[in-house]
Structure formats: C-alpha cells, structure tokens
Amino acid sequence: MKIKMNSKDVNFWYGEKKALNDINLPIYENKITALIGPSGCGKSTFLRCLNRMNDLISGVKITGEITLDEKNIYDKDVDVVELRKRVGMVFQKPNPFPMSIYDNIAYGPRIHGIKDKKQLDEIVEWALKKSALWDDVKEDLKKSALKLSGGQQQRLCIARTIAVKPDVILMDEPCSALDPISTLKIEDLMVELKKEYTIVIVTHNMQQASRVSDYTGFFMLGDLVEFNKTDKLFVEPENKKTEDYISGRFG
C-alpha cells in the first residue's frame, strides 16, 4: 500500500506554546484517514501542517518533515500555491465565495491558467457531478452560491476543491455545521471520492470516524497517542487513553 503523505518527527509551536510533539503518521493513498481527539489536542493543527495553512499565522515554527510523494513540502523550493492545489482543503463552515455557483467552481482552474470557456464548462459539470450536486443546481449555475442550503454549500466547497484536480483532500470537521441528512450525503461522498483521492478528515464525531475512515489517529495534548486501522483502533485499542476516550470516559 502506497504512502501518499508521511510525517516524521513533526513538532509545532504557536509562539512559545508547543502544539505538536514528535508526530509520525503515514497517510495512505486512496484511503480515508480520520484524526480524532478532544478539543485542543492538536488534530486540526496537524491537518493544517499538511498543506502549510499554518504558514499564514505569524510566530509559528515547525520542525521535522512532511512529505508528499516523498518530497518534503517544507523544502525551500516548494511552491506553496502549487502545494495547496495538490493538497486541497474543505473547512468546518461552508465558505462559498459571494459569486455564482459556476464562478465558484471555475475560480481555481482560472487562477491556474485555464481560460477556455468550453474547458471550464466541462470542469464545472464534472466537479459538480463528482460532489453529487449537479442535479440540484444544473438548471441555474448563475445563481449565487450563498443561496444554497448549508449541505449544498459544503458539497459546493468540495466541488471547488476537486476542480483543480488535487491529490489529497483535507477536511476539517466538514459536517459539524450540517444536519444529519446532509452529513450522511457528505459521508457517502467521501467514500466515493477516495477511489480517486486521498482524504484526511478531522472529526469530533467518533461514529463518523468509524463509519467512513480506513485509518484513525487519536491525538491528545499534542501527542499522537495511537494510530491504526480504524476497525482495530475502535474495537481493540492498544492504549488505555484511547480506550478511555472512545468509551466516553473523558474528552
């Protein structure tokens, strides 16, 4: 099984405050890896290290290495814009741009140099179909994306992410603002998307992690306490802290 991204001895600080301690975690290609743990445990910080989103915060420091196809993404010669094209991100709260559905999806491809209308039309249709939104919106692509429901907006954000053909999709609690039906649609979509993409999801919802992921990492106080196949971690955790967390004894 191919490792798509790998972290080796990753430590991270916000100013003086250390947020991650020696994280070693492989991310396997075409699998869903879930990161779980109590609030403030470091899981979202780690997720944002994977496409250098933390670079946007002043005073942060990272040591160790994170590789994408065996190339360290923190090397001096890495183009961060290109990295974020290859490693896309879907946030907790749906964040459609204040423009039409069509222009939301075409935004990334245009930035990366695609100007041909026919090509853009094809990308928009393809991405909306992949994100299970096409049938809902195909009659009115000029409609403002802000008029979509919360669940539709989140699927639009997924479509916008895949429109630039990433290798990896990062999802930071993508369902926490959604109702149960919208959540199930996003979960079904994730399982479908992993055929072509590698997915990493941060979630507070342990049932969600157990339903959709192939591998799970449990974080606590900046440490990766345990990493294993999801069915193994939830059924036979090797660490007492993991067992306490998933059985609801703390967190």
Swiss-Prot record:
Chain residues that bind ATP: 37-44
Biological process terms in GO annotation: phosphate ion transmembrane transport
Protein's UniProt keywords contain S-adenosyl-L-methionine: no
Catalysed reaction equations from the record: phosphate(out) + ATP + H2O = ADP + 2 phosphate(in) + H(+)
Top-level taxon: Archaea
UniProt enzyme class: translocase
Location in or out of the cell: Cell membrane
Its EC number(s): 7.3.2.1
Domain (ABC transporter): residue spans on this chain: 5-246
PROSITE patterns: ABC_TRANSPORTER_1 (PS00211), ABC_TRANSPORTER_2 (PS50893), PSTB (PS51238)
Record keywords: ATP-binding, Cell membrane, Membrane, Nucleotide-binding, Phosphate transport, Translocase, Transport
InterPro entries: AAA+_ATPase, ABC_transporter-like_ATP-bd, ABC_transporter-like_CS, P-loop_NTPase, PstB-like
Gene Ontology CC, one term: plasma membrane
GO molecular function: ATP binding; ATP hydrolysis activity; ATPase-coupled phosphate ion transmembrane transporter activity
Membrane topology field: Peripheral membrane protein
Family affiliation: Belongs to the ABC transporter superfamily. Phosphate importer (TC 3.A.1.7) family.
Quaternary organization: The complex is composed of two ATP-binding proteins (PstB), two transmembrane proteins (PstC and PstA) and a solute-binding protein (PstS).
Function of the protein: Part of the ABC transporter complex PstSACB involved in phosphate import. Responsible for energy coupling to the transport system.
NCBIfam families: 3a0107s01c2
Protein name per Swiss-Prot or TrEMBL: Phosphate import ATP-binding protein PstB
